[in-house]
Amino acid sequence: MAKKVKKVVPQGIAHIHSTYQNTIVSFSDLKGNVFAWSSSGAIGYKGTKKKTPYAAGLAAAAALEKAKEFGLKEVSILVKGVGPGKATARKQIEASGLTIKEVKDVTPTPHNGTRPPKKILKRM
């Protein structure tokens, strides 16, 4: 049986997807292949605790530990979503000692697309 060789990824992309209910942090190579990920739910939080910024920070730290095993040194951060944990997750990655190439907000915004649900219309 052949010995499994661990992939080395010196440069990567950190994707932070923050929703009102959860925060998902994943690390991919430059082609987009995910090699490490974590989320607020995956680290053990359930229900309303998943959406807290503290849980998002722990999810980012857990994903960072997995990503550092692959030799990650330089990262671009892509933030998507409107949840409360996106800033905390970003700060956790910035404080980790990795070289940050760029921080970009890639939240999709409609150019007057479909009609939003009733609860969002009430807020407007």
From Swiss-Prot:
- One GO molecular-function annotation for this sequence? structural constituent of ribosome
Q: Name one GO biological process term.
A: translation
Q: Which cysteines are joined by disulfide bonds?
A: none
Record has RNA-binding as a keyword: yes
Chain spans, region Disordered: 102-124
Record's PROSITE patterns? RIBOSOMAL_S11 (PS00054)
Q: Superkingdom of the source?
A: Bacteria
A Gene Ontology term for the protein's cellular component: ribosome
The protein's matches in InterPro entries, at most eight in alphabetical order, are given as:
Ribosomal_uS11, Ribosomal_uS11_bac-type, Ribosomal_uS11_CS, Ribosomal_uS11_sf
Which of UniProt's keywords are assigned here? Answer: Ribonucleoprotein, Ribosomal protein, RNA-binding, rRNA-binding
**Classification via Gene3D superfamilies:** Ribosomal protein S11
Of which family is this protein a member? Belongs to the universal ribosomal protein uS11 family.
Tell me which PANTHER family the record gives. 40S RIBOSOMAL PROTEIN S14/30S RIBOSOMAL PROTEIN S11 (PTHR11759)
Function summary? Located on the platform of the 30S subunit, it bridges several disparate RNA helices of the 16S rRNA. Forms part of the Shine-Dalgarno cleft in the 70S ribosome.
Subunit: Part of the 30S ribosomal subunit. Interacts with proteins S7 and S18. Binds to IF-3.
Kindly provide the name given to this protein in its UniProt entry. Small ribosomal subunit protein uS11
What is the source species? Metamycoplasma arthritidis (strain 158L3-1)
